[in-house]
């Protein structure tokens, strides 16, 4: 299935992908090579997923390496509990519908959109929400969801048995790909959950839905992903009263919810758990994190795991 198979490369090198548990198909890489007549092994973590992520399996642990290159996106923080975040999402949707508005949910097309659909379906089945109309207004998310549907072999056991990314009795899912279909959503004044890109509101169809809903007090915007400083999403999260959207200044009257437990990235504890699975004290290179975060994570790794660590500078080359 793409994971766990050993592949040969010229010069005696070999590699294998293992499930990183981040999004569908994400992988860590094991690479074996010869050095001075001896076999050596380097592991590249890739983006490591969070334990208990919806739909996909938890990250697979690796136990041996001479060198490990590990990400540090959230190397200095711990995530909010997922179940508490799911309860917050249900509450936000119910409050919005009670006010007679629409829910706008900016979302990444791959991973987050599918997770949100899965969670909404679960909330409907549990009776926490009912009679939902969900619009996935993103051609890329539509294509990504079709890929998810085609590969249930990568799902965890719970997802395999519970959700098929199709409409059910209590939740109608509408995938809209054409501009005409997208524009029709603008006629809906209440009772819709509109999922659209981009996740940080820098482009995509979410801006068009903002134009028709962001000035309405009865509507809401639910952010489930980190908003980078300088983006429209971050501007809204930080409490802006108005914003230029599609060339027009608009008042931001919709209620803004920021729900923090949906990250697909491992937090500090889960990164340490993944790294702690190595039994032979590899040398660790910490990458893919803002410098203060990477340095703080390096300190934690040294203190808690006793490993030799290094944080490379951007563009730095290292010989191993």
Please report, for each region that a protein language model flagged, where it lies by residue.
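Short, solvent-exposed amphipathic alpha-helical segments in soluble enzyme
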Residues: 31-34, 59-62, 119-126, 151-153, ...
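Active-site metal-binding loops of divalent metal-dependent hydrolases
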Residues: 23, 46-48, 72-74, 108-110, ...
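His/Asp/Glu-rich metal-coordinating catalytic cores
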Residues: 1-115, 121-128, 133
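Redox- and metal-dependent alpha/beta enzyme cores, enriched for Fe-S-associated oxidoreductases
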Residues: 215-251
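Generic long, charged, amphipathic alpha-helical segments
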Residues: 244-274
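Hard-cation-handling environments
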Residues: 92-229
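C-terminal structured "cap/appendage" subdomains that terminate the fold
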Residues: 271-302
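Hydrophobic, well-ordered secondary-structure elements that form the walls
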Residues: 206, 284, 309
């Amino acid at each position: 299935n793409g994971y766990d198979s050993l592949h040969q490369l010229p010069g005696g090198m070999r590699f294998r992908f293992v499930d990183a548990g981040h999004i569908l198909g994400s992988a860590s890489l094991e690479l074996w090579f010869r050095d001075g007549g001896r076999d050596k092994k380097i592991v590249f973590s890739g983006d490591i997923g969070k334990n208990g992520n919806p739909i996909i399996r938890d990250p697979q642990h690796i136990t041996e390496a001479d060198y490990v290159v590990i990400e540090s996106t959230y190397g200095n923080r711990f995530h909010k509990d997922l179940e508490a975040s799911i309860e917050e999402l249900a509450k936000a949707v119910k409050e919005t519908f009670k006010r007679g508005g629409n829910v706008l949910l900016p979302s990444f097309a791959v991973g987050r959109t599918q997770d949100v659909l899965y969670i909404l379906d679960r909330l409907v089945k549990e009776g926490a929400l009912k009679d939902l109309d969900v619009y996935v207004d993103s051609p890329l998310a539509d294509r990504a969801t079709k890929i998810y549907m085609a590969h249930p072999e990568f799902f965890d056991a719970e997802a395999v048995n519970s959700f098929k990314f199709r409409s059910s009795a209590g939740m109608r899912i509408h995938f809209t790909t054409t501009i005409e279909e997208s524009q029709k959503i603008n006629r809906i004044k209440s009772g819709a959950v509109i999922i659209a890109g981009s996740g940080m509101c820098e482009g995509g169809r979410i801006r068009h839905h903002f134009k028709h809903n962001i000035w309405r007090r009865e509507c809401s915007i639910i952010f489930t992903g980190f908003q980078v400083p300088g983006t429209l999403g971050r501007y809204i999260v930080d409490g802006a009263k108005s914003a230029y959207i599609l060339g027009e200044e608009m008042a931001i009257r919709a209620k803004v919810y920021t729900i923090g437990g949906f990250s697909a990235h491992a937090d500090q504890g889960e990164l340490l758990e993944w790294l702690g699975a190595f039994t032979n004290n590899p040398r660790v290179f910490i990458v893919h994190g803002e410098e203060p975060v990477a340095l703080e994570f390096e300190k934690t790794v040294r203190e808690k795991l006793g490993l030799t660590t290094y944080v490379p500078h951007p563009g730095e080359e290292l010989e191993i």
